[in-house]
Amino acid sequence: MSNRESGVLMHISSLPGNYGIGSFGKSAYDFVDFLVRTKQTYWQILPLGTTSYGDSPYQSFSAFAGNTNFIDFDILIEEGLINKEDVLTNWGEDETTVDYALLYEKRRPVLEKAVAAFLAKGKTPAYEKFVEEKAEWLEPFAEYMAIKESFDMKPWTAWSDEAIKRRQPDALAEYRTRLADKLEYHRVTQFFFDEQWHALKKYANDNFIQIIGDMPIYVAADSVEMWATPHYFKTDEEGNPLCVAGCPADDFSPLGQLWGNPIYNWEAMKEDGYTWWSKRLQASFELFDVVRIDHFRGFSAYWEIPASAENATIGKWVKGPGYDLFKAVKEQLGELPIIAEDLGFMDEDVINLREATGFPGMKILEFGFMGENPKSGDLPHHYPVNAVAYTGTHDNDTVLGWYKSATEETREFCNRYLNRRDEEPISFALLRGLFGSVSRMTVATMQDLLQLDETARMNIPSTLGGNWVWRMTEEQLTESVEEFLLGITELYDRANPHHNVDVKEELVEEEK
């Protein structure tokens, strides 16, 4: 990240397409082309992990496995694993949202047919290599999902068989034999995910676009990690979390945020040389060029809440592993291309940790206008060079939604700060201010480029339902959007030097 650069935040699920959710298919390749035409350097996405209840990519059944919802059906058709007739069904009434319940019902039979066709042809060398190389996480994941399905998708602590809850060898061998077909299904679909994702990433990298991935700091209570490696977490004898993660109360959340994720047993991880973290980050760097770590402050100190608590007001700050973790991982992996999500309550220890690692932190422009205070560190004239600047994150409202709900004083301060003209869309005004900052890297949220309101918001923290569903349509990505993004990218010296494309000339050629 040595030069001034920019990118776009757009999750895979939000891409347009024919099958109810964005995928690794044509629309993803088209999006790379859009980034090239607008001279971007980065495509930032949310976590790619398999989602569980609530559909959040930050609550996954595995810290390593991929989300099979993103497997593209058209690619499977091209490979002869399914037919077009297999996907001729209603994938949702509204192309601007994801219907996860519908996907859960309809995707599995299609993927099962593809898996059967794949296995009927004989296991390929590429598949056998994948299974061998990824066995350390792939086998426990396949076991967990197959057994979980046999118990009606209940979390492992609710399984009625005590022997398999505790992974006793005889019980595990019996389930592996009985559920052999289900285990193979999960191995093969993870292979499909891996093949399609790496083909897409190669296309992006070949076109000088780097992928910024996202890694949640915590794992879910209902996850293979809790089942297979409980010693890495603070649990009781039954495997239930003794305490969970969250955030204390603040002006935005009077009761705090109760995430419910189990807390790590950092002493056990330290005794193991933080090997689990090295493996997790290594797996992430195989998927992404840069990794954003969510809730970075949790490595300095984290808010620990009793598992029985009804909200996050009852808790305490507990010291985290600090620099020792990153020192150990760096010794094992080398340089770490990481972005530290350092938002929220920041004290001197967190700042010192971020500076010790050298990781760039984050700045959120929407925060800068709250309180109408020119001294706010989230206003561009205070940004450090070593930072990644955003209008907002997946947890923020879109710029238009935020502006509509802001006070008259905040709107007036915002307009005056940005020297905004009446006819200038507020989303474009904030993006203009963002790209003009001294921060080495800026990331535009796709919804803001499209000037969308609160209905396109990705997530409202501490709420269930209606989150993670927004999708873009092909018609929304217009020539004027491209021209605006290209314009501010070039004007503020963020253009990718490898992309010497005149978007206007290319559009004229396409029309011919």
Model region roles, listed by residue range:
Residues 451-510:
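Structured C-terminal cap/extension of enzyme domains
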Residues 26-33, 195-203, 277-279, 426-430:
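Short alpha-helical segments and helix-capping/turn motifs at coil-helix boundaries
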Residues 36, 197-205, 330, 354-355:
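Surface-exposed amphipathic alpha-helices with a cationic face
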Residues 1-13, 29:
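N-terminal regions that are enriched for targeting/export leaders
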Residues 2, 11, 55-190, 219-443, ...:
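Alpha-amylase-like alpha-glycosidases and glucanotransferases acting on alpha-linked glucans and related
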